Amino acid sequence: MTYVVGVTGGIGSGKSAATAEFEKLGITVIDADIVSRQVVMPGTPCLRAIAEHFGRDLLTDKGELDRKALRQKVFSDPAEKDWLNSLLHPAIREEILTQLEQASSPYVILSAPLLLENNLDKYCQRVLVVDVPEELQLQRTIQRDESPKEEVEAIMKAQLSRKARLRKADDILNNESSIDQLRRQVNQLHQRYLAATVAQEE
């Protein structure tokens, strides 16, 4: 059985920087955000269902999903959002499980902003939370995405609170300092996870 480490953290916490360091160590990273884009690529059953349900004006000239238009369509309509989630969540889950089965590194990172909210942690042996104070989350996200403060705060509210996330963590990676500090922590965790995979196989 593949040893899976679930990585999560609030918006702006630096999940991508952390998982990139694991990748440099030869570890397979399955990113739920990337999977969510893969399941709606041209030719997929999900994209066909979305076009039938919402109309073809949600497709670009190239036949790709206009994600911004879709977000606007479902943002203020809970029923449509539920319909979309009931279509996408099972497809994303299935694709994640397929990629987990195909992974060949000693252990696998499953990175998902909503790992805990969407119960993806049930596929993981460990949960690693990338953590920064909420003020820093806000500051980093506004700088990175050039988003209005209110929009970032709304996203943060929709996610688990920092306190609730930390309660569910097996491991915590503090990311309020430098990239060197992040790298050191990743290296330590990497050794721990390698040891855990060996123990699991014995």
Curated annotation (Swiss-Prot):
CDD domains: DPCK. It is found in: Cytoplasm. Its EC number is 2.7.1.24. Keywords: ATP-binding, Coenzyme A biosynthesis, Cytoplasm, Kinase, Nucleotide-binding, Transferase. It comes from the Bacteria. Coiled coil: none annotated. One of its GO terms (biological process) is coenzyme A biosynthetic process. Pfam families: CoaE. InterPro entries: Depp_CoAkinase, P-loop_NTPase. Residues 4-200 form the DPCK domain. Pathway: Cofactor biosynthesis; coenzyme A biosynthesis; CoA from (R)-pantothenate: step 5/5. It catalyses: 3'-dephospho-CoA + ATP = ADP + CoA + H(+). GO terms for cellular component: cytoplasm. HAMAP family: Dephospho_CoA_kinase. Belongs to the CoaE family. Catalyzes the phosphorylation of the 3'-hydroxyl group of dephosphocoenzyme A to form coenzyme A. This is Dephospho-CoA kinase. It comes from Idiomarina loihiensis (strain ATCC BAA-735 / DSM 15497 / L2-TR). The gene is coaE.
